[in-house]
Amino acid sequence: SSHNPGQSFTTGTTTTVVYTATDAFANVGQCAFTITVTATDTTPPVVTVSSSTITRQVEVGTPGVNVFFTEPTATDNSGQAILISRTNQPGDFFSVGQTIVTYTFQDPSGNPASGTVTINVIEVDTTPPVVTVPSTTITRQVEVGSSGVNVFYTEPTATDNSGQAILTSRTNQPGDFFPVGQTTVTYTFQDPSGNPASGTVTINVIEVDTTPPVVTVPSTTITRQVEVGSSGVNVFYTEPTATDNSGQAILTSRTNQPGDFFPVGQTTVTYTFSQDPSGNPASATVTINVIEVDTTPPVVTVPSTTITRQVEIGTPGVNVFYTEPTATDNSGIANLVSRTNQPGDFFPVGQTDVTYTFQDPSGNPSSGTVTINVVEVDTTSPVITVPSNTITREVELGTPGVNVFYTEPTATDNSGIANLVSRTNQPGDFFNVGQTVVTYTFQDPSGNPASGTVTINVVEVDTTPPQVFVTTGEVVRTAPFGSSGVNVFFTEPVAIDNSGTADLVSQTAQPGDFFPIGSTVVTYRYRDASGNEATGTFTVTVEEMVDTTPPTVTVSGGNIVRTVELGQSRLSVIYTEPTATDNSGEANLVSRTAQPGDLFPVGTTTVEYVYQDPAGNEGRGQFTVTVIAVDTTPPSVNCPNNVFQEVELGTSSAPVFFTEPTAFDISGQANLVTRTAAPGDSFPVGTTSVSYIFSDNSGNEAEPCTFTVTISAVDTTPPTVNCINNVAQTVQLGTGSTQVFFTEPTAFDISGQTSLVTRTSAPGDSFPVGTTSVTYIFTDASGNNAQPCTFNVVINAVDTTPPTVNCANNIAQTIELGSTSAVVNYAEPSATDISGTAFLVSRSSSPGDSFPIGSTTVTYIFSDQSGNEAPPCVFTVTIGTVDTMMPMFTSCPNNIVQSVELGVPGTVISWTTPTANDAAGIASIVSNLQPGSFFTVGESATVTYVATDNSGLTDNSCSFTVTVFAVDTTPPSVVCTNNVFQTVELGTNPVQVFYTEPTASDISGQANLVSRTNVPGDSFPVGTSTVTYVFADNSGNTADACSFTITVTAQDTTPPTVNCITNIVRTVELGTSSVQVFYNEPTASDLGQASLVSRTAQPGDNFPVGVNPVTYVFGDNSGNQADPCTFTITVNTQDTTPPTVTCISDITRVVELGTTSVGISYTEPTATDISGTATLDSRSHTPGQNFPVGSTVVSYFFSD
């Protein structure tokens, strides 16, 4: 080396030390480092503060101000003192209160020094209070002639930035008496700094007139009559008039006037008087009734005059629903008064007349008739017998179908005839594989159809097992020496089946499975959908490789480092010896350069262990043992005593200077590592712990030197008092004093503790009417007294008792029936008050007002001059009527004569119910017989009506007679036959047709067939023929002719017969996506013309790999479509190309002489295949494995 430890080096210089090492083969290595010796400066800078305290004033409520000042400066023995921090700077914003600004300087050796400037920002109050007036103008009304009124209002208040604004004067207060006219009330406030502020309230007292005019109505209701259909009439009447206490009442509006046109109905005419000198309004109404008189009967609408319903032959009748007749009337109302039947009633076979009678409110009647015809018909379909609903036949797989013979369905009918009109197939037809539904349709002579079906199932049966293809042959793989086997990948056998599907049901192994060393037989088993099975087998052989792998040596502890005390030359070292493992299971130690417990010199020694396996492969392990001489003794520290210092209470911190700790070390050098504070630093109020830590050049650290700096605060500031506003409270007039509760003033002190020294009153004390001054004085724990807190308690006496009211009793009065209102006079309610004055505020009616029939509520409200309102005085005025007039019939029916059909025993007779009028209203109109009663042929009955009004008075002057006689005018009722439809096979003409003949009935009991154009069993040509029947009764009444049609249709109903083809299979090379396929197309034959309707593919089309269904559909000229012919074209792929392997080049590595093996990493070979997948079956080695010195062959095997 160029230098030795312990050698002397010059201050202020940097020296490079070089170590050189040489081995036995003259290989050289070097280590170099530098040693720098520096002189240390420990004297801090000197700080100069030009002005230690600066004071600025701001307005009360201002948060602070920007302050400019001369900054402290510093000098140092090094000639350089750098400002490293300051808590504020000139021009910064400073909040109200005291702020300490600290400046810290440092010399180039890192010695710090501090100086402080105290900034005091003080609030000064020059702002007057802010006065709030809830309402600047207050208006009160008094009766004309009153001199004034006591007025209550919410007083103005004031706020101030000091938190206290005191009321010093007011020219009036709430509850004072204010004369008629305008009075200005002034309030003056002042804050603790003497700044004044004022606010005013204007009181307006106004005289008003509140009595409305009195209106007189000569006649409240006027009635006029007009003809029905008239829109109205001009009406003349005497108009209402009005008087007022002012001597003047003006008519300001009226909704109509005498001579105006009034429409039919009730019209209310309103007269409004107002605009007396005070503008008080009053209203009155006149009711104009215009009444129509009606003599026109309702108009009846019958939606359907004749309704026909059919019933099964032998059924007596049926319940019939229909839309009922309706009626309209010029009055807007037409009431149904009778009906002989209603929707839903049971009607017998034959004809029934239903009569509806309507009547309007004036008793005018009107009738309408609905005829119900119930006809017997045959609607029962034939009954079909199917010998066998489902027939199943089996065919070989791939056969398109088979001819099937079966017993055909038959049919019977209540008419005795059931004809087969169509069938979709017949016995002996060819049926395709699958399910075919054969439909048979029968029809009776009345055209009622019925159908039956036979299902033909043709099923394919499969007995051929799948064919298994094993493409791999024997599979041979190698396994590393010592392993039990290897995972082997191979191409799996595949299977095909004539059904198109062969499922793998079991396998004894699969690609990637682990195979042991030796030969293993692998078996695959497949099964088709019919349960036919087939197997395929092959052999997998695994061979073991030769051992070339050296033992693996494990050095458990790694390199070893030990220390000795400075001056010792060697050390005995104990360690865990390296171990070795080998794939053969045996590794022997053949040599070692040292062993545990040997003496190792100061410095680094290399230790090597060598192991060998039975095949002679060697493995080596190395580690180093380093012995280092070190210094372990820490420095000795001289620590100072604790430091104590006082500041003003409220000051948060102060700079403190103290003597720093020193240290000594046996090496001659002790360095300050860290310190938590330095002389001149700012310390907060309280106790702060300061720590210094020293260390020597060997890193030995002494125990920390810790001492405390304690800053104590002294209090000289009086408490701050939160005074309260003046307290105001009202009492009942005449009360001398009252107990008052208020929130007491509070105080706050920077010491956190205040006490109440004295108070002149407390919450809950009794205060007299007037103003009482209350004073609170607070002090803190240091005896600093705050300024006294003074406020006023003001007690006001007011009147809160409402007047006492003498209310009137309820009033009842009667008038003649027909009058609508009456004028009522009464003694008005009165009121008294403790103040001596009570006045009427409002009333809903006055004596002499006109009140309508019924009960009217009258309300009076009184108040005193203090605004106390009494509860409302409420009573009722009730106007009743008296009736002395008997009712009078306004209409009565004439005598009634009615004819009925011969054989009918009688009929229901309806008439318009008589009407009657009465001023009191009609309570009831009753009679011995009602409209809609049944009257017998030959009978003459008297009908009498009695009317009674709501007062019990009666009139029985309405009576009339009802007479019924019989006449035959009705023709027979015919039940006609429905149109007949029959189908024959194409080419058949004519055909015999059977049908049910029309029938007729008559009320006389005899209906005769007069003529017919055909009879059942006649032959009819293809096309439509008309058949007519005519009936008459013995009285010569002929019924309308009964006509119906017979339509014979020739129809082709047989679909074409299709010759379908079998499924097609093609094979292509793997990677080919599709192939062109040619085939013979399906064909079809038909009784008429068979044609191809659609096909999903055709010969020569390209078909993709997979199963492709192809469908052909055939039809004939009659629209009969055969079942679709469907077959499949399957395109399979086959792979015969082995994978393409990308191998890597030979690898050569050079190792140190004596090394037996080395780990080698490389990029593994890869393979691709046209199938998209190439699988690694086995490999003799892996990247990173140890390879011995010499040549080793590495093998990789791939397959698809």
From Swiss-Prot:
GO terms for cellular component: extracellular region. It is found in: Secreted, Extracellular space, Extracellular matrix. Residues 1-39, 40-123, 124-207, 208-292, 293-376, 377-460, 461-544, 546-629, 630-713, 714-797, 798-881, 882-966, 967-1050, 1051-1133, 1134-1200 form the HYR domain. Its main location: secreted. Glycosylated. It holds the Pfam family HYR. One of its GO terms (biological process) is cell adhesion. Keywords: Cell adhesion, Extracellular matrix, Glycoprotein, Repeat, Secreted. It comes from the Eukaryota. Major constituent of the hyaline layer. The hyaline layer of echinoderm embryos is an extraembryonic matrix that functions as a substrate for cell adhesion through early development. PANTHER family: FI04643P-RELATED (PTHR24273), HYALIN (PTHR24273:SF32). Homooligomer in presence of calcium. This is Hyalin. It comes from Strongylocentrotus purpuratus.
